Amino acid sequence: MRLLLRHQACLVLVAVLIFMTNLGGYALFNEDEPKNATCGAEMFRRGDWLVPTFNESLRTDKPILVYWLMLVSYTVFGVSEFSARFASSLLSVGTTLLTYHLGRKLYSAEIGFFASLILCTSLLFSAVGRASTPDATLIFFITLAFTCYVWVVAWQRNGNFSGGEQDCEPQQQAGEGSTLANTTDVQSPGSRVEPRPLPMNWRLATPFFVAIGFAVLAKGPVGVVLPAAILMLFLLITFRERDQELEKLKPIAGPWWRRGGSMLRQLFGWERILEAVRGVHFGIGFGIVLAVALPWYLAVGIKTDGNWLRGFFLDHNLGRALSAKENHNGFPFYSLYYLVVIHLSCFP
């Protein structure tokens, strides 16, 4: 317990120094920060918590959550650069702590500590955490979703997500309604058990999907598409490894291209996909996501006669996928640019 408290105190201290120091001491940067902050300020002055505007014109770039957070901050601190950025900084401190608890549950407290320390000191994350943009909010809620998932699975499996020793006490397994609750025996120290999907108990899955609902309010469809794709791929790989251990799959032979094709067919078979969908209650989960996010989308659509929905989904989502926007035209060998930028942005 003392180790956990020391780790968390150290991480909070480092994160607060990185994300809060001189937060309002410089002007809003680039185009996104001024537009987002001004949009929030206009809503604040009107007392409007529903329709985002910039220069009194409808702003369809991003959903409402980043503006709600700004409105709360403006109410407490007044309209300023500091208050426009405060929510992003606070949530980035939260993401740092979530990464610690995610890492210590997956591996160990030491690994979780260094993973979160590396995250909060990386250049791009520290920049995002000091900007009045929705990115820090999206990162926080997706990280929260996966932290909930990992901790619930570990709770169902006596405090252990994937086998081996953990730094937490075993807990009671989930009760009735879970098809996997009684399938895992108590493990001896150092044993290895393959990861299993979230149990068939939708109540335990609720925190995961509630967090995704807020991610959708932060940045739209990417808030559900990204975590759903990650979780689905994890489950499909897990099921394939399980079937290999149980010798349900035929050995793959032949040249590399044939082995690769056979592996993909095994990985993305319909039975395995349906098992993954049922395993984490994607049907019920989609309903939970809608319950969190849909009321505002419906309300803003009605208030603007559908103009906000058309602008956001058709222009800023579908349009961005089909054509260049906001001077992001790309250039030959642009992938090399991202190879360099990714390495620099993750420094040190």
Where are the regions that the model predicts?
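Membrane-integral, polyisoprenol-dependent glycosyltransferases
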Residues: M1-P348
